[in-house]
């Protein structure tokens, strides 16, 4: 059971998420003050800031297996350097199919200079709101990995979450290694919202 201090930290993250998401909706939909307050309260008191996501494939080995994995994903209201960090295992829309989602490591963000191992390719700098994502499996070739080496930079707006826990099998599961900053932020969320039994029930063997 989570301690009182952990609950306070969890509620602080939940409040930040609720406010950020509600203000985002307000800017796009021009909500009334009453509607804005209702959404904030709904997200704060009734919603979760995590969800379950299934994924498989060799691209994220060893964090994930080639078989089915059930992931606990922390929702990201706005994908910027305040919420996601280099080294995080992020969930993003497939740049070639917006109905599908990928799990990849965030390798670089706007302002980073990207230098290819191929001398024929010119270095370039990631533009505003661009990021570079890579597969974790070092044994895969670039085309097999299906990451930014294949489809290029992606919009940070396409990042929807961060994987914080992975259930590979009923007896093989644990927290996902992310940046130190992210893992520190995610620890109270794991303490409160992680339900391994629920993950196991949703797991597709």
UniProtKB/Swiss-Prot annotation:
Keywords on record: Hydrolase, Membrane, Mitochondrion, Mitochondrion inner membrane
Q: Which InterPro entries match?
A: LexA/Signal_pep-like_sf, Mitochondrial_IM_protease, Peptidase_S26
Where on the tree of life does the source sit, at the highest rank? Eukaryota
The enzyme's E.C. designation:
3.4.21.-
| Disulphide bonds in the chain | none
Where found, per UniProt? Mitochondrion inner membrane
Indicate the residues that form the catalytic site. 59, 104
One Gene Ontology CC term in the entry: plant-type vacuole
Entry GO MF terms: serine-type endopeptidase activity
Q: If you read the UniProt record, what top EC class would you report for this enzyme, in one word?
A: hydrolase
Which processes are annotated in GO (biological process)? signal peptide processing
Phenotype reported upon loss of the gene: No visible phenotype.
* Family per similarity comment: Belongs to the peptidase S26 family. IMP1 subfamily.
- Give the function comment from the record: Catalyzes the removal of transit peptides required for the targeting of proteins from the mitochondrial matrix, across the inner membrane, into the inter-membrane space.
**What is known about its subunit structure?**
Heterodimer of 2 subunits, IMP1A/B and IMP12.
Entry protein name: Mitochondrial ATP-independent inner membrane protease subunit 2
Species assigned in the record? Arabidopsis thaliana
Q: What is the lineage of its organism?
A: Eukaryota, Viridiplantae, Streptophyta, Embryophyta, Tracheophyta
User: Gene that codes for this?
Assistant: IMP1B
